[in-house]
Structure formats: C-alpha cells, structure tokens
Amino acid sequence: MSELITTPVETTAKAELVSLAKLGEMRTHVGMVKRYWNPKMGFFIEPERKHNNDHFVLELQRQSLQTAYNYVKEVAQNNGQILFVGTKNDYVKKLVNNIAKRVDVAFITQRWLGGTLTNFKTLSISINKLNKLVEKQAENAADLTKKENLMLSREIERLEKFFGGVKSLKRLPNLLIVDDPVYEKNAVAEANILRIPVVALCNTNTNPELVDFIIPANNHQPQSTCLLMNLLADAVAEAKAMPTMFAYKPDEEIQIEIPQKQEAPRQVVNRANSKQITSQRLNITRNPEVLTRE
C-alpha cells in the first residue's frame, strides 16, 4: 500500500472545484454517529464534537477531494483503465451506472464476485463469452429458431447483469473508485493485494490505511454521494474533453434532486369485515346453537 495522501496539491488558477458552501449544503461533512467512529479517521474530524454525529473539517475535505480529482484526471489522461464500484443500495447502483456510462468507464453495480480482480483471467473468459454471444445474436438472429433466440437472450441477460459494466476491460484496472470502502471491503481488499490505487468516499467508520486517496465524506446520504461521485466522474470527463456536470461550476448550476422515501401504504384490517369475508368464502351460516355448512 502506498502512504496515506493528505497533502493538498497546487491547483490551477481557475475557479475552485466546488465551494465550501455547496459541500455544506449537500451535508458532505456529516459523519456517522460517534460510537461508530474509527480513531484513525480522527485527523479529518472536527475536534469539538458537539453533535450526535461526527463532523468532518470541510477545508480538509475539499483539499482531499481536489487531490483525488487531480489523480483521477491524470490516470484518465494516460489512458488508464478506471473501475467504479457501487453495490450498496438501489440508489448507489443507479448513480454509479449513470455516471460510469456518462464518462465511458467500467463499472460494477451488482454483487462483487470474489476474484474479480485477483482472478482476472477467469473474469476475462466470462467477458469474452458475453461479447461472443452478443456478436452471435447480432449476426445470426435470422438463422436461429425462436427457442434458440430466447435461450440466447436469456444467457446474454444473465451475463450482462454481472459483466455488462466491465465488458470493455481488456486488462486489470489502473484505478478503483468506490463510494463506501467499508461496504465494498472485498473489492478494496483485492485492489490492495494487486496494489491497484483506491479512491474512496470515507465515512468516519473507515480504516483510511486501506485507501490510497481518501475523501473524508458522508457516503450515507444521496445528495452527498451524488455530488462527490459525479465530481470524480467529471475528472474523467475533463481528461477526455467531455462536458462536466458539477466540476468548477457555480453553486447555482449544481442542482441535485434528493430522492424522497416512498412509504408503503398502510393496510388497515377491519376485523369485522375480515370475519364476514371468511364466513362468506367458507359458505358458513352461523347459528346460536349449531354451526352448519350450507
């Protein structure tokens, strides 16, 4: 593992990557409840712990973000392979899927399969199989029977689920970007074994020694995760001369829609109606003296 990188880098003369005000508005500085903290993250946490949750020092957060941004940009400029990983929940899966496709890099949003990196040869076999099946379906669809087409489509769908995001990988990635290194511990562990640099959003419960480029941040709230992961994707976009979404934009142009939790409708059971319905279903007539079935 390389040494922890916490020193800010020299930035260009252009506008700041993102303002402290916007970081605060998106609650990127709000960590986890104090009892979950990892003492090794203490360097990034406000010393005056006045809140129920630990809070990150915003200036340190911005410096770390700029350092990570510059490194991601450098890797992309050198045609390095970058892999985004986010499997924690439906929101993160959709987010990672969208941003990776936006900047045309590999991604994994389904369950991390053991050996994805450490046994890359086996992964390559699955990727080659998927690519050949897609090619076969495109070229020979008219010559296949309806049943053969259906079976082929099902096999492609199964492989796409796990390998669709990495089918462009021709070699091991040069950089791994994860939204939560605690949840994605298997991916981080494999990257560490192979000495692949890791960029990660590290909450207060993270062991920073496992991550090369730490971004101390709230990775449990959608608006924070969305802002920071998109900024890392913008580093790739800038390197490829593609449009960026949030990087170096004024605050008023950074709009993030916060998803609302949809509560399941309450089912109110009317016991009287329930008994009545049950009686009707069983075709039962109640008599004070005897219970008979009509």
Curated annotation (Swiss-Prot):
Lineage, uppermost ranks: Bacteria, Bacillati, Mycoplasmatota, Mycoplasmoidales, Mycoplasmoidaceae
Q: Which GO terms describe its biological process?
A: translation
Q: What UniProt keywords apply to this chain's record, in alphabetical order?
A: Ribonucleoprotein, Ribosomal protein
Report the protein name in the record: Small ribosomal subunit protein uS2
Which InterPro entries does its entry note? Ribosomal_uS2 (IPR001865), Ribosomal_uS2_bac/mit/plastid (IPR005706), Ribosomal_uS2_CS (IPR018130), Ribosomal_uS2_flav_dom_sf (IPR023591)
Q: Name one GO cellular component term.
A: cytosolic small ribosomal subunit
Instruction: List the HAMAP family hit by this protein, alphabetically.
Output: Ribosomal_uS2_B
Q: Name the gene behind this protein.
A: rpsB
SUPFAM superfamilies named in the record? Ribosomal protein S2
Q: Which Pfam families match?
A: Ribosomal_S2
Q: Which GO terms describe its molecular function?
A: structural constituent of ribosome
Which CDD domains does the protein's record reference?
RPS2
Q: Which PANTHER family match?
A: 30S RIBOSOMAL PROTEIN S2 PROKARYOTIC AND ORGANELLAR, SMALL RIBOSOMAL SUBUNIT PROTEIN US2M
Q: Which organism is it from?
A: Mycoplasma pneumoniae (strain ATCC 29342 / M129 / Subtype 1)
Q: Where is the secretion signal located?
A: none
Matching Gene3D superfamilies: Glucose-6-phosphate isomerase like protein, domain 1, Helix hairpin bin
